[in-house]
């Protein structure tokens, strides 16, 4: 191999033919990372919004009824799957009726949950916001949680989040529309 002459070295430094390829090689990983990050953030926000909509729908559908049969409640809980679409993971949903006593303590009078989820037990005390603790009243209380697993599970730096996912959850309180609903002979009063 011949030693490089000073004129050859100057010519090499002035040559700009590969500059675009080098710039692309440096910027492409950054641009790809930004794109994947934007997609993941928007997907996560959309999934969280679906969780909030599901909690609201469960409480709203339960608060509208005066009596709720077991079949009606199964349909209400099944609606959570439809609302969460296109997210196909397991949605854990609970609906409870809370009776608030004269001391503003909210206790569960009946509770149901989606398949594989333990409902709140009758008599459980539930902490509710102070402005909702109206003595001698009732509330419908829904809880929804969803395990969101990011699409970028194949990227090693995200493996800690990607393997376990992120738990998205929300709760909703609604006042019964007409009277506190009776669920399968269990009154909410």
Tell me the role of every PLM-derived stretch.
Residues 1-83:
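Alpha-helical assembly-interface signal, strongest on the long, hydrophobic N-terminal helix that forms
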Residues 56, 60-189:
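Short, conserved structural patches
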